[in-house]
Amino acid sequence: MLGQVVTLILLLLLKVYQGKGCQGSADHVVSISGVPLQLQPNSIQTKVDSIAWKKLLPSQNGFHHILKWENGSLPSNTSNDRFSFIVKNLSLLIKAAQQQDSGLYCLEVTSISGKVQTATFQVFVFESLLPDKVEKPRLQGQGKILDRGRCQVALSCLVSRDGNVSYAWYRGSKLIQTAGNLTYLDEEVDINGTHTYTCNVSNPVSWESHTLNLTQDCQNAHQEFRFWPFLVIIVILSALFLGTLACFCVWRRKRKEKQSETSPKEFLTIYEDVKDLKTRRNHEQEQTFPGGGSTIYSMIQSQSSAPTSQEPAYTLYSLIQPSRKSGSRKRNHSPSFNSTIYEVIGKSQPKAQNPARLSRKELENFDVYS
């Protein structure tokens, strides 16, 4: 109702002010708010030197310059940025017309010769009774892996001005949901299926849509899910390997300890250097474990002169059993202990002696090996 009143007032003003600035009949232009509006004059058959677009302001009882243009220069906009000038056809463009843009517009074209031509437009901008144009929706979503090769998809679709709008959901090209107020979608799909979703928002005059592909989310989750069994297998094999290695090390250590306990001790070798026949000492050598033995080396330097090079040396070997009688030299009483006695002498004709009849002094001249 208010728009009709404004229109009637403008028509009356047009009759009053017509002829005071712009001559001729006015072209009527009707538009709705929120859409671009272009005022284009008929073809001008003269060489243009300058132009001026003006709008009638009833409050000021005259015309107000919107923009000016001279040949070879840029347009000079004396109004706001909602107006622009198209040089090619001398048109005035209102980017988004509003109700306050209604009124009388006049175009003055000045030729090079100074002749002025005019064109008049009566503009009526009405508020649309229909909803505004739908904006592009904001579609967000994510995929989550589930058991048995399933993927859970969660989506949300919103617009800034959602009054009197309807929502429709598509998976690929298939319509899956037609509920008008359903801004959220939650469903389970197969991992190997289609994961491209489209949200369509519409009202009686326009519609917009937004598409989102969640294939990568579901595939990445599926690959992560398939990786877990391999990871578990690797961990189990590593644990088995480490356990086997630890058992082997323990078994080897116990085996070495057992071998060290059962293995016989090494033989003990005693070296004795006797330089003086008068030196007397008791030789004690005891076998501490069965089956063992010891070797006694006695280096004896006799007081007699060493054999000369003319006298050949002979070696006497005798196998004796040590006496059980205690004496100055103690021996092992084990039956398995045997002694080998040999003597290096410098006699020309060695004479074997009975080891059993040798005196202690004579026995000291022998080397004993066991």
Curated annotation (Swiss-Prot):
Q: Where is this motif: ITSM 4?
A: 340-345
Taken from the UniProt record, the cysteine pairs bridged by disulfide bonds within this chain are C157-C199
Q: Name one GO cellular component term.
A: membrane raft
Write out the ranges of the annotated region (Disordered).
324-370
Known tissue expression: Expressed in spleen, PBL, followed by lung, liver, testis and small intestine. Expressed in all natural killer (NK) cells, monocytes and basophils, TCR-gamma/delta+ T-cells, monocytes, basophils, and on a subset of CD8(+) T-cells.
The effect of K68A is: Disrupts interaction with CD48
On this chain, the residues bearing Phosphotyrosine are Y271, Y297, Y317, Y342
Query: Signal peptide position in this chain?
Result: 1-21
Where does the Ig-like domain lie? 22-127, 131-215
Q: How is it modified after translation?
A: N-linked glycosylation is essential for the binding to its ligand CD48. Also O-glycosylated, in contrast, O-linked sialylation has a negative impact on ligand binding.
Q: Name one GO molecular function term.
A: MHC class I protein binding
**GO annotations under biological process?**
adaptive immune response; immune response; natural killer cell activation; natural killer cell activation involved in immune response; positive regulation of granzyme B production; positive regulation of inositol phosphate biosynthetic process; positive regulation of interleukin-8 production; positive regulation of type II interferon production
Query: Which parts of the sequence lie on the Cytoplasmic side of the lipid bilayer?
Result: 251-370
What superkingdom does the record give? Eukaryota
Tell me where the transmembrane regions lie.
230-250
Q: Find motif (ITSM 3) and give its ranges.
A: 315-320
Q: Where in the cell is it found?
A: Membrane; Cell membrane; Membrane raft
Domain notes for this protein: The ITSMs (immunoreceptor tyrosine-based switch motifs) with the consensus sequence T-X-Y-X-X-[VI] present in SLAM family receptors have overlapping specificity for activating and inhibitory SH2 domain-containing binding partners. Especially they mediate the interaction with the SH2 domain of SH2D1A and SH2D1B. A 'three-pronged' mechanism is proposed involving threonine (position -2), phosphorylated tyrosine (position 0) and valine/isoleucine (position +3).
User: Which named protein is this?
Assistant: Natural killer cell receptor 2B4
What is the native source organism of this protein? Answer: Homo sapiens (Human)
